[in-house]
Amino acid sequence: MTGHTPAGNNTANIIKRNEMTLIKSISGIRGTIGGRVGNTLNPLDIVKFTSAYATFIRRTSKVASNKIVVGRDARISGPMVRKVVCGTLMGMGFDVVDIGLATTPTTEIAVTMEGACGGIIITASHNPRMWNALKLLNEKGEFLNKEEGNE
């Protein structure tokens, strides 16, 4: 058949197109869900970044609380990412306040209302649907600054 692309090649092209390199910035860690470790936002990367954040919060937070607030948007990957994030935080001894579906401002406010030592927002905002992100908050419900994020 003329013009036919073998399924293997087509699948490889789709995967390559959908596997975007992780983006680490002041607003968090963003990437496409799945794919190779270190290149995308897959469960192992989520555990790695969540545990690094938890270690940072434990070392730097001025709040006596052991609570971390977790909120997420309605992306299809949200429940999976939430389970990995919450499980990692609980495994590290934190009390997770899972507020479920919530906007970024709602999650930011929940951090201060709960007297939490930090928060994680699971959202990729304006990025395409195959993306997701971990947006990291301090005890004031503010995004980590560049210096904090680099730690």
Task: Locate predicted features.
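Generic hydrophobic-segment detector
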Residues: 1, 17-21, 61, 123, ...
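Ser/Thr-rich, low-complexity intrinsically disordered segments
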Residues: 3-17
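An N-terminal, well-structured beta->alpha segment
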Residues: 14-87, 91-92
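Helix N-cap and loop-to-helix transition residues
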Residues: 25, 42, 103, 144-145
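Alpha-helical scaffold segments in soluble metabolic enzymes
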Residues: 48, 52-55, 106-109, 151
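Ferredoxin-reductase
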Residues: 62-142
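Glycine-rich phosphate-binding loop plus the immediately following alpha-helix
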Residues: 141-151
